[in-house]
């Protein structure tokens, strides 16, 4: 009887794992790439660059001054760097939202949803705060001049797109639950954060409806 070599047995045990990992990487390249980049940045800002985080926020974060001056080139970076140093909760939400969207709509649309919903949210939130500040809101006046950045709005935008693309009544239930959560979040999040999340979700719903129409038109 021939006894298989130990190395051969170990290689056979590793092969399904390696094959499975490669399969996941091929199926969800955008989700894995963005999550990896954001986590690495989070680790770096929480350790090596922790003392420089405020300077990074001032240079990259989006606020009224950035909008007025047309400093939009920093917006992509602002989507990837968090407003607080270190690892944050929405990094998990990103995987839970972006992964299903990439599966349902494809990698390109997942990438576009991630960035576009955040960019639309950044501009609309700043304009909303500016309008509220003009109406006498002291909170809005303070926040509209406070630089902000992060990927939580992008994650919620992707989640809203996924909810919109669900079949039948599931979409209505999911969107209703998301709307209740976002409305209630104004009681525990700052006005700018809650507004940004709501705006991103709105952009995600619009994108989700477009993708539903596109999918239906293709069948």
What are these regions (language model features)?
Residues 13-57:
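N-terminal signal-anchor transmembrane alpha helix
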Residues 22-37, 70-72, 148, 168-188:
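Aromatic-enriched alpha-helical transmembrane segments of multi-pass intramembrane proteins
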Residues 38-44, 118-127, 177-192:
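Aromatic-anchored segments of alpha-helical transmembrane domains
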Residues 45-107:
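N-terminal TM1-TM2 helical hairpin plus the immediately adjacent luminal interfacial "cap"
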Residues 74, 92-99, 153-161, 176-186:
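Hydrophobic, membrane-inserted alpha-helices
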Residues 189-205:
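Loop-to-transmembrane alpha-helix initiation sites
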């Amino acid at each position: 009887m021939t006894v298989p070599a130990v190395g051969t047995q170990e290689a056979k045990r590793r092969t399904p794992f390696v094959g499975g990992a490669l399969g996941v990487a091929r199926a969800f390249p955008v989700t894995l790439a963005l999550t990896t980049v954001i986590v690495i940045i989070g680790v770096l800002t929480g350790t090596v660059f922790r003392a420089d985080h405020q300077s990074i926020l001032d240079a990259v974060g989006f606020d009224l001054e950035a909008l007025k001056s047309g400093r939009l080139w920093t917006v992509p970076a602002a989507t990837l760097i968090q407003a607080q140093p270190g690892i944050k909760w929405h990094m998990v939400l990103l995987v839970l939202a972006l992964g299903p969207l990439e599966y349902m709509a494809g990698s390109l649309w997942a990438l576009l949803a991630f960035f576009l919903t955040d960019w639309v949210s950044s501009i609309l939130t700043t304009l909303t705060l500016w309008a509220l500040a003009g109406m006498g809101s002291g909170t809005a006046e303070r926040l509209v001049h406070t630089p902000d950045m992060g990927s939580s709005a992008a994650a919620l935008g992707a989640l809203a797109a996924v909810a919109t693309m669900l079949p039948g009544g599931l979409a209505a239930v999911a969107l209703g639950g998301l709307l209740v959560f976002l409305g209630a979040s104004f009681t525990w999040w700052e006005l700018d954060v809650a507004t940004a999340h709501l705006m991103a979700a709105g952009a995600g719903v619009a994108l989700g409806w477009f993708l539903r129409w596109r999918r239906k038109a293709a069948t």
